């Protein structure tokens, strides 16, 4: 977790409980469950809460197809999986001609190759397949190297004035990789901003 994310949470009054980076998001989930058991509380279950899929089915997907009905391919990074699965369910439910491609770090290609590893793309690649995710639902799984995504953050800002985060830049790279094989518009989901990651980007 970047220093900026930690500060933002602390500013909101949150008590930060940090887990070893080597444990990945699985370690954070286990710690959250332990806190609920020992101290009481509510476990939102980001990786297994069907409300995430429902939200993207009811809001994100309709917005996409209202604004860009010509879209033929959508690239979404998979953290909890709610975005990609929610959009795909909407496409199927409405019989739309559009493919959904999941994106994961090349250093941790768990969905595509079955192996997990450390990587630089915060927000995706939890090093376990979330309960919300059915990998067979996707039309393809793309991978992007962390170093390439970090570089792309700067390139997007300098070229287009887009100040996005690392997973957003990775989605753009994934979308570019589809250009030769896609006849129509390609949309990349950009879910985060660069101001959450300066310490991770400029070291």
Task: Locate each region found by the language model.
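Short beta-strands and strand-loop turn motifs
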Residues: 16-18, 43-47
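A glycine-rich helix N-cap at a beta->alpha junction
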Residues: 1-35
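Glycine-rich phosphate/pyrophosphate-binding loop at beta-loop-alpha junctions
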Residues: 26, 48-143, 148-149, 177-203
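Short, conserved catalytic or adaptor-binding loops enriched in Gly and charged residues
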Residues: 8, 33-37, 129-136
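Short glycine/threonine-rich catalytic loop with a Thr-x-Gly-x-Asp
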Residues: 44, 160-169
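A structural micro-motif
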Residues: 14, 39-41, 98, 184
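A short glycine/serine-rich beta->alpha loop
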Residues: 72-73, 157-163
């Amino acid at each position: 977790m970047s220093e900026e994310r930690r500060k933002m949470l602390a500013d909101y009054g949150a008590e930060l409980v940090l887990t070893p980076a080597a444990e990945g998001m699985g370690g954070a989930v286990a710690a959250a469950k332990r806190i609920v058991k020992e101290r009481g509380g509510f476990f939102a279950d980001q990786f297994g809460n069907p409300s995430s899929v429902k939200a993207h089915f009811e809001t994100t997907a309709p917005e996409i197809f209202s604004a860009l009905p010509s879209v033929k391919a959508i690239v979404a990074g998979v953290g909890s999986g709610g975005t990609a699965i929610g959009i795909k369910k909407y496409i199927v439910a409405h019989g739309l001609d559009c493919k959904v491609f999941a994106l994961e770090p090349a250093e941790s290609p768990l969905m595509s190759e079955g192996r997990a590893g450390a990587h630089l793309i915060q927000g995706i690649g939890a090093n376990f397949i979330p309960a919300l995710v059915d990998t067979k639902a996707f039309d393809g799984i793309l991978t992007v190297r962390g170093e390439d995504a970090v570089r792309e953050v700067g390139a997007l800002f300098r070229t287009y004035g887009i100040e996005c985060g690392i997973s957003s830049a990775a989605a753009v790279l994934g979308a570019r990789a589809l250009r030769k094989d896609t006849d129509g518009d390609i949309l990349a989901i950009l879910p985060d901003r660069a101001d959450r990651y300066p310490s991770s980007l400029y070291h």
